[in-house]
Amino acid sequence: MLFRSPEVGICAGNIEIIDSNGRVMPGKEQRKRDLPFRRLDFDDLFLDRKPGPMAPTLMFRREGLEKVGGFDPDIRLEDVYIELAVTKAGYVIDILGEVLAQYRKHPTNTYKNARFMVDNVFKTYSQFSDHPDYEQVIMRFRNSMFLKCSNRDKVLARELLSGLPLKYWNEKTFRGIARLFFS
């Protein structure tokens, strides 16, 4: 795919979720297994218009990585940053509609470390603060993480809520408030 399509900077596929013992998880855990082929540009990723690529399946065009200066050593959530940087440079991401990897779900997956995710996604998004919808993107992420943290990490949840202006409150905000104070 990369050879035939010079506009493609990253190629990826879907994933199948397995548990810590290597068993395939039930259907409700497989939201990212049967997604159709999709092509994403910068706005598709940044504005979350289409499901993004799965990190374990990423294959990069060397020229694309070189064009953006490679990975940023100050951002430890490398996949989100490099996907955005490569698409901002004018490339697209093609995601095949087939499973290319299994992803093991266990208690210490990176995405379960809320503080790490919040800090690094904010740091990543700040690299693209010139986008006209930057504030909306930040507030959507803040709302989403507030809801996730509201019954897991109440200190972080309160911090996220305190940075969420009323004009960005939505159903997730109210669900998070209910969890924060009643769970």
Label each region the model flagged.
Residues 30-31:
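Residue-level structural signal for beta-strand termini and adjacent loop
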Residues 47-48, 81, 88, 93, ...:
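C-terminal subregions of glycosyltransferases and related glycan-biosynthesis enzymes
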Residues 13, 34-120:
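Conserved nucleotide-sugar donor-binding catalytic segment
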Residues 1, 64-65, 124-127:
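Residues within well-ordered alpha helices
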Residues 1-27:
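Conserved donor NDP-sugar-binding/catalytic core segment of glycosyltransferases
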Residues 12, 22, 69-70, 152:
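Glycine-centered small-residue hotspots that permit tight backbone geometry or close packing
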